[in-house]
Regions:
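Amphipathic protein-protein interaction modules
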Residues: 89-165, 297, 301, 386-421
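Surface-exposed, low-hydrophobicity interaction/linker segments
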Residues: 329-377
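Well-ordered, non-membrane alpha-helical segments in soluble/globular domains
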Residues: 218-222, 365-376, 407-412
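Alpha-helical transmembrane anchor segments and their immediate juxtamembrane flanks
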Residues: 1-9
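Extended, low-hydrophobicity segments enriched in charged/polar residues
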Residues: 185-350
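Short, extreme N-terminal segment that most often corresponds to the first beta-strand
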Residues: 17-68, 442-449
Length: 449
């Protein structure tokens, strides 16, 4: 199991809070020879000039944003000047091939450009320009084509080199650049705490630790890269609050109940492995029956409280908003993220992550078999995947919002599963208002009191 740390003191701008690092990045970023080798060895049916596509996009963006060194502009002015007249018509691929010997490297850029290159193109970290290119290829071609034998893991070489490609990537690069300039970290969290270390050991899979930061761009880019890789690699990525003692207690209580929750975060790995095996080998409960029982409980509670189910609980489908961002990892006290772990849980199906993260079974929070049953149903119905959690919060990510005609039924299920989303919400919260959120949202948020 590998553990990586997103903050690496030698990495450009990791700890310098958006200012330029002392050391200038002069290293190699990319070499067309690597991509040409793929084309030749795999016999890919593409023109060899395509090996330079993504490099030309990066170079053009940096020229447009005045990130090139004075030496570069002087030395190559004759060749670059015609491009400067109309960059939208510029094809820098031949220039990179013939003048730069097919390479991009830090010395081509001015101080700011080199520092940004070190951050975004120097190391296979997050965010990382080549990974953003791969993500765009997935978005452009769709899953089936992207993972097809035709592309042989090299879909990026097949993207048509046109203005649409450039503009799509320019938008991504602008976001990365703005994040890099404004980013700051809580220095006290740069190294994982003892609890975070224990949590990663408990998860026993590839984990990346993220310190507390003001902009979640590195976190979300890493999550999105992992999501793309997960299809081939066979894991499910989950973002987990790292310094959550109650979450730790819940995990141990469920998977290693004989442990008295030692102060040094000790646990019995054999017992934990046994628990996981047991949960994964048991047949998943009848999802519909589990949800119907939960909804039945809510109806009984409404009756006990003399509340009219249709009028007061369901209400009208109105007053919603769109929710497309995770909120469970934000600390509202300082507007920074909590320290987080991105875990690549080694399971085949999204609902099976709860065998590794059995955080429920207290108050109204469902137990592990119930979590698995409901998550399986929602994945099959809506493509919903559990994506982020703390001890009392759980967020699902969906490929698209629930269609309006199905939103009310889905909202009733969500209320059955987690009554606090409405009962602990604003006074006028209803299932209908929740349905109005669902029809606009790709993130479902749950919170148990």
């Amino acid at each position: 199991a590998g553990i990586s740390f997103v903050v690496n003191p030698t990495r450009q701008n990791a700890i310098t809070r958006g200012t330029l690092a002392e050391e200038e990045f002069t290293g190699d970023m990319d070499d067309a020879a690597w991509h040409l080798e793929s084309i030749q060895e795999k016999g890919l049916p593409v023109n060899e000039i395509n090996a330079y596509n993504h490099m030309a996009i990066y170079l053009r963006w940096c020229i447009e944003h005045d990130l090139m060194s004075a030496e570069f502009m002087e030395r190559y002015w004759e060749q670059v000047q015609p491009f400067m007249a109309d960059l939208s018509r510029a094809d820098l691929r031949g220039f990179i091939r013939d003048q730069l010997k097919g390479q991009l490297f830090g010395a081509l850029f001015n101080k700011e450009g080199a520092a940004f290159a070190g951050y975004y193109y120097g190391e296979a970290d997050s965010p990382y320009f080549p990974s953003d290119i791969d993500n765009y290829a997935l978005e452009y071609f769709g899953s089936e084509q992207y993972y097809s034998d035709k592309f042989q893991d090299e879909a990026y070489l097949f993207i048509p080199f046109d203005e649409n490609y450039y503009q799509a990537m320019a938008k991504v690069m602008e976001k990365r650049f703005a994040n890099w300039q404004g980013q700051s970290f809580d220095e006290a969290t740069l190294e994982p705490s003892d609890l975070a270390e224990a949590m990663m050991e408990y998860l026993d899979c590839e984990c990346t630790y993220f310190p507390s930061m003001t902009d979640d761009d590195p976190i979300m880019s890493a999550y999105n890269y992992a999501k793309r890789e997960s299809v081939k690699e066979g894991f499910v990525p989950v973002l987990i609050k790292a310094d959550d003692e109650i979450l730790w207690e819940c995990l141990i209580m469920n998977s290693n109940p004989d442990s008295d929750g030692e102060d040094d975060f000790a646990f019995d790995p054999d017992k934990v492995a046994e628990y996981r095996k047991k949960m994964l080998s048991a047949p998943v409960e009848n999802s519909k029956a589990v949800l119907e029982e939960m909804i039945g409980q809510r109806k009984e509670e409404a009756e006990d409280d003399d509340m009219d189910w249709d009028e007061e609980i369901l209400g009208e489908m109105e007053g919603g908003y769109d929710n497309r961002r995770f909120s469970s990892y934000w600390n509202s006290d300082n507007n920074m993220t909590y320290p987080l772990i991105l875990a690549k849980i080694p399971v085949k199906n999204p609902w099976e992550i709860f065998a590794y993260l059995p955080f429920g079974g207290w108050n109204e929070c469902p137990n592990t078999p119930e979590l698995m049953a409901v998550a399986k149903y929602w994945f099959e119905q809506h493509g919903a995947v559990p994506a982020a959690m703390s001890h009392d919060e759980l967020e699902f990510l969906l490929p698209a919002p629930v269609p309006e005609e199905k939103a009310m039924d889905a909202a009733v299920e969500l209320y059955g599963f987690c009554p606090d989303v409405i009962d602990q919400g604003p006074e006028d919260a209803t299932v209908g208002a929740l349905a109005d959120v669902l029809r606009q949202s790709t993130v479902w948020y749950f919170w148990w009191d």
